[in-house]
């Protein structure tokens, strides 16, 4: 189904674990050339790359802290130097940072949350834009930018997660502007919006707590990262979604139904 992704050049930010890593694996299985990214070099990087490169594609690790605008540009530059261009950008970097109710939020916390969840996607996309445009023109198809939203972007977030929810809602909104002004360049912009997944995001919860929370969803449980990964392939594939732009695909087990 995703045969047209073979050889495609895919940059995935924040992809050393969880949903991001599952996406790296999925693209590698499809035969793509993929850059895994993270702030820190994983302790098991050598073994991870060996495993990933045995799946059928080519995977490298490019370290960068994408909450820093300067490093966003360097990341894109490093990727293009390695692969010669960009066909697909997945803005997966993000995180809660911490939980603070409104009375406790200060400038430092505001900056940390928005830099990681909003600014990173903006700046990486900004630097990738000319390369995505060039790839679309060269291939005669479309390039793809995939944002990663959240159910919190709809609901406002849980206790102490209001800023996180707002940062994700910002992504839901800014995508509309990018669609309006850059789809003409052969670039499609779409969003994968996960619900509650069993990742490090919920590492503070024990299994009983996760089971209790998950029982309140129609699917009755948390999602697994590998269940979200195929949605990235769908939006990346011109054959599957060449006429789809500006859309949000909610992957949440029925937790929230817009």
Specify the residue positions occupied by each region the protein language model found.
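Conserved glycine-rich Rossmann-like NAD(P)H-binding loop of the short-chain dehydrogenase/reductase
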Residues: 30-47
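Catalytic loop of short-chain dehydrogenase/reductase
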Residues: 94, 133, 137-170, 175-184, ...
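Amphipathic alpha-helical dimer-interface segment in Rossmann-like NAD(P)H-dependent oxidoreductases
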Residues: 77, 116-139, 179-180, 184, ...
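Catalytic Tyr-X3-Lys loop
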Residues: 103-123, 146, 171
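Short, small/polar-rich loop/turn modules that mediate ligand/substrate recognition or access, typified
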Residues: 85, 183, 188, 240-245
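C-terminal substrate-recognition "lid" of short-chain dehydrogenase/reductases
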Residues: 221-251, 256
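Conserved glycine-rich cofactor-binding loop
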Residues: 16-17
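Substrate-binding pocket helix/loop in short-chain dehydrogenase/reductase
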Residues: 100-102, 106-114, 202, 209, ...
